[in-house]
């Protein structure tokens, strides 16, 4: 099946604005995938959108709406993409493929793509967010190059999946991007290949910072998301059918006596108070200590937040209370399967696995890993990380961008 890629704002733009000679296939139609597809279309980049049959995102609605996505916020108006069921057709028609999905379901996307390895050798893939995609999957997939963003370039939320509406709250001022195989300039500095720089300039308006693939694993979302989620875990409703009849009756009585707040809960503004921010900063210290053991110098959690949005918040609590972009909607976990307890768990376990290679202890990080597993009722009796990086050696880490791997006894505080 051949597909005709379209990328038009409606009504059609002025005649002197010609489409760019670039075609993109977005794989994943959740909040960020839908928003990025519309963003690329707004920049006149022909865009196809694909998702697996069981994907909970918006692709069915987009197909029913003839490929039209309506946006509000940073860009406004309807934009048309080509929603497609045929992954092979998307691969053949796209110069660049962009995976936009949770890290804890990367396996299923990789399994789908591996069926087309013969056609991937000339393709570049961008993974948003990467979470160590190249480290984990480069041997299973035969892409020309694997690029990974350290964070999503876009902050967005599907506001009405039935009508394909998405609120694009912010475009990041900057984000990190890695390339594997690692490319270096004439001076030996890690850089993006020259033939890709114009492509990324067409796709994104942000300042792109080239980083090694290993550094992608250390991005701080696992702290800003998982820590407040765990520390507010008591807000979650009990799982369906988990209560006895008597317990259900008593819960109803409690709700009648003191009804739960009708208004929503602002995850950042209300869920990350000063005490929670203190915990985040301590776990951030552990994160940066492990990165330093690999020769990677990371900015603090607060500095990363300010760099992303080009802001000057003085404290992490101030950042969490800012009206936009994180307190626009009541976006908060409602069960233990939410990505803050799943995707970010993968990242915490990856950092812990690297720490084990460097023989560094992470008491707080391990505590949060164990609490998430315990909350899911799946505590690992061996205490061993499920991260594939647990099987790596120091030389493996160096292959993906570590300059060295110090043992903790060699490190100077």
From Swiss-Prot:
E.C. code: 1.5.1.19
GO molecular function: D-nopaline dehydrogenase activity; NAD binding; oxidoreductase activity, acting on the CH-OH group of donors, NAD or NADP as acceptor
Gene3D superfamilies with a match to the protein in the record: N-(1-d-carboxylethyl)-l-norvaline Dehydrogenase, domain 2, NAD(P)-binding Rossmann-like Domain
Record's keyword terms, sorted: Crown gall tumor, NADP, Oxidoreductase, Plasmid
Catalytic class of the enzyme: oxidoreductase
Biological processes annotated in GO: glycerol-3-phosphate catabolic process
Catalysed reactions listed for this entry: D-nopaline + NADP(+) + H2O = L-arginine + 2-oxoglutarate + NADPH + H(+)
UniProt cross-references to InterPro entries, sorted A to Z: 6-PGluconate_DH-like_C_sf, 6PGD_dom2, G3P_DH_NAD-dep_N, NAD(P)-bd_dom_sf, Opine_DH
Coiled coil: none
Assembly mode: Homotetramer.
Protein family (similarity comment): Belongs to the lysopine/nopaline/octopine/opine/vitopine dehydrogenases family.
Protein name: D-nopaline dehydrogenase
Organism: Agrobacterium tumefaciens (strain T37)
């Amino acid at each position: 099946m051949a597909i005709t890629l379209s990328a038009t704002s409606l009504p059609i733009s002025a005649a002197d604005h010609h489409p760019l000679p670039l075609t993109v296939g977005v794989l994943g139609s959740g909040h960020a995938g839908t928003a990025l597809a519309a963003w690329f279309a707004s920049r006149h980049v022909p865009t196809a959108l694909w998702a697996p049959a069981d994907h909970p995102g918006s692709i069915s609605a987009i197909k029913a709406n003839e490929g039209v996505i309506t946006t509000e916020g940073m860009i406004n108006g309807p934009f048309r993409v080509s929603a497609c069921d045929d992954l092979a057709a998307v691969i053949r028609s796209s110069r660049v493929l962009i995976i936009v999905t949770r890290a804890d379901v990367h396996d299923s996307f990789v399994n789908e793509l591996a069926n087309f390895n013969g056609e991937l050798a000339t393709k570049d893939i961008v993974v948003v967010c990467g979470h160590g995609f190249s480290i984990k999957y480069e041997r299973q997939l035969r892409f020309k190059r694997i690029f990974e963003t350290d964070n999503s370039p876009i902050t967005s939320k599907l506001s009405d999946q039935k009508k394909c509406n998405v609120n694009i709250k912010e475009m990041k001022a900057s984000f990190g991007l890695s390339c594997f195989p690692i490319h270096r300039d004439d001076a030996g500095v890690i850089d993006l290949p020259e033939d890709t720089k114009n492509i990324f300039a067409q796709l994104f308006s942000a300042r792109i910072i080239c980083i090694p693939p290993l550094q992608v694993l250390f991005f701080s979302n696992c702290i800003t998301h998982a820590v407040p989620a765990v520390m507010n875990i008591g807000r979650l409703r009990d799982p369906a059918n988990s209560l006895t009849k008597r317990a259900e009756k008593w819960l109803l009585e409690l709700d009648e006596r003191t009804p739960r707040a009708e208004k929503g809960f602002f995850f950042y503004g209300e869920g990350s108070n000063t005490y929670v921010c203190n915990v985040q900063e301590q776990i951030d210290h552990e994160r940066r200590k492990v990165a330093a053991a690999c020769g990677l110098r990371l900015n603090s959690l607060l500095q990363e937040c300010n760099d992303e949005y080009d802001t000057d918040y003085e404290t992490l609590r101030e950042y969490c209370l800012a009206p936009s972009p994180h307190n626009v909607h009541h976006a908060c976990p409602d069960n233990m399967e939410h990505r803050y307890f799943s995707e970010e768990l993968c990242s915490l376990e990856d950092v812990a696995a690297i720490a084990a290679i460097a023989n560094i202890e992470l008491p707080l990080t391990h505590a949060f890993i164990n609490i998430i597993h315990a909350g899911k009722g799946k505590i690992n009796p061996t205490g061993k990380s499920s991260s594939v990086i647990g099987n790596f050696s120091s030389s493996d880490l160096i292959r993906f961008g570590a300059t060295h791997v110090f043992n903790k006894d060699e490190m100077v505080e």
